[in-house]
Structures are given as C-alpha cells and as structure tokens.
C-alpha cells in the first residue's frame, strides 16, 4: 500500500498548500508513489487517518483548532509544519501584542458569536512537531525534499544559514552596505534564493530566523542606520515576529520606548 499523505489547514492563507500544486510535474510523479488521502485544497476525496506524513499549514487561533490539532497529531506518524503561520504564528500573531476583545468589538457587528483565542500561536506550542519547513510561502523544492527524505526513511536536511550567504553565492551587492537599505538578511534563514536583495530590496524575514543569528549585533546594525525604537520593533514584528529570538528582541526594544 502506498504511504498516505494528509494536508491540513488551520489559520492561514492557503499559500503554502498551493506550493504542492505549484510543483506541477513533480507532483504528478509524487502522486505515483503516495496516496494523498486528505488534501481538500486539491481533491474532494477525504480518507480518515492514520497517515504516514501529515503537513500542517496555519496557526492556532481558536479553541476548536487547539482541540483539532491534537487529533491530527494522534493520526500522524510524521507531522511537518509548513510556513510562517504554522512555524511562528504568522502575521496574525500581531494580535498577541494587542487587545483581542477590542478587535472583536470594532471588526464584528456581533462579537458575541466569535469564538477565538487571544493569541495566534505556532503548532509546536500545542503538539510535538517532527519537522518544520519555514517560509511565506514555503519553497516547493524544500517541500519535495522533505517528502523524498521521509519516503526514503532519511532525516530531512534543509539549509538554515542566513540569506547573506545566498547573496554571496549569487554575487549580489549588499543592499545594506551599498544602498543603506534596512535588511533582515543577516538574521534570516535562506530558502527564498535571496529574492528581495536580488532586486535591490532589503530582506523582510519571510523564512524566519537563521541558526547562526546574532540579534545583539543586528540591533546595533539597525541603530547605525538610524532605525531604533518603534521602527526597529515594527521591522522585527513582521511575518515571523512571534518566533522567540525576534519576539524577545522586539520586546526588549519596546521596553526602552518612552
């Protein structure tokens, strides 16, 4: 019997699920090797677990989602989180620094019908996660690499060095040095191919923190560019803002703002 793959969605935009479909020809080859037992984005057939490999997109933002992810974990041999929402809480984690009750009153005409948590949190804060694929959205080649590794009973190995290394490989002129552009590249993991710096834009941190980051040095770099206080906090509280090293750094800076 073919290995069974499931793809579940929580609070997210569907962009990381679409990377499966963007694989196109590679997806067709993969479909010959596995059974996509549960993948509502791609097919109407839904087969109940257990599953050999489960991919989860999205963060936990409601009480029902918090219960549902536990059931998904119980049905999965390997569980892989995909994308910034699942690995770091996503852009919606900005609510974690705000008053969710105020949002409910302002946004919804009948807030009493809205069942939501006060926070948006990554999957790893609720269950055991076997592997993580970072990005907003994830890179389809990294996704396929993880699938191939797990099917081969090998541990997936994805790059975790900084975007700066990718810029060096591509021969990019450093946007920080040459253009004085604010850039999260020194503390962001590779995976995008240094997309923004290649077009003379600073990195926005879509792929989360690199393993070899130095946040103290990075804060000094921002300060040297005149980026301090609330502006520095805003740059860190982005797509992956709730991931621990960036969250702690932004919170520390925030405490110095008068």
Residue ranges and their predicted role:
Residues 93-94:
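Active-site-proximal loop->helix
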Residues 98:
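Short beta-strand elements at the ligand-binding edges of bilobed clamshell
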Residues 1-55, 60, 65-66, 70-78, ...:
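Iron-sulfur (Fe-S) cluster-binding modules
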Residues 85-90:
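Short gly/pro/ser/thr-enriched loop/turn and capping motifs at secondary-structure boundaries
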């Amino acid at each position: 019997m073919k290995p069974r793959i499931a793809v579940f969605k929580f609070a997210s935009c569907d962009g990381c699920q679409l990377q499966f479909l963007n694989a196109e020809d590679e997806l067709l080859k993969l479909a010959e090797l596995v059974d996509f037992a549960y993948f509502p984005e791609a097919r109407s057939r839904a087969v109940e677990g257990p599953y050999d490999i489960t991919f989860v997109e999205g963060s936990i933002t409601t009480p029902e989602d918090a219960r549902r992810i536990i059931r998904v974990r119980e049905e999965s041999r390997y569980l892989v989180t995909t994308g910034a929402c699942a690995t770091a809480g996503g852009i919606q984690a900005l609510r974690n620094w705000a008053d969710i009750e105020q949002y409910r009153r302002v946004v919804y005409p009948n807030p009493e019908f809205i069942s939501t948590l006060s926070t948006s949190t990554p999957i790893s804060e609720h269950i055991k996660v076997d592997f993580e694929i970072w990005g907003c959205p994830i890179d389809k080649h990294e996704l396929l690499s993880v699938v191939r590794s797990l099917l081969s009973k090998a541990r997936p190995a994805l790059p975790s060095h900084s975007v700066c290394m990718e810029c060096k490989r591509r021969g990019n002129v450093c946007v920080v040095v040459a253009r004085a552009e604010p850039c999260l590249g020194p503390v962001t993991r590779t995976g995008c191919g240094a997309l923004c710096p290649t077009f003379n834009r600073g990195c926005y941190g879509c792929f989360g923190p690199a393993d070899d980051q130095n946040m103290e040095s990075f804060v000094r770099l921002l300060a040297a560019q005149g980026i301090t206080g609330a502006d520095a906090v805003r740059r860190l509280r982005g797509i992956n803002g709730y991931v621990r090293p960036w969250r702690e750094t932004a919170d520390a800076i925030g405490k110095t703002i008068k």
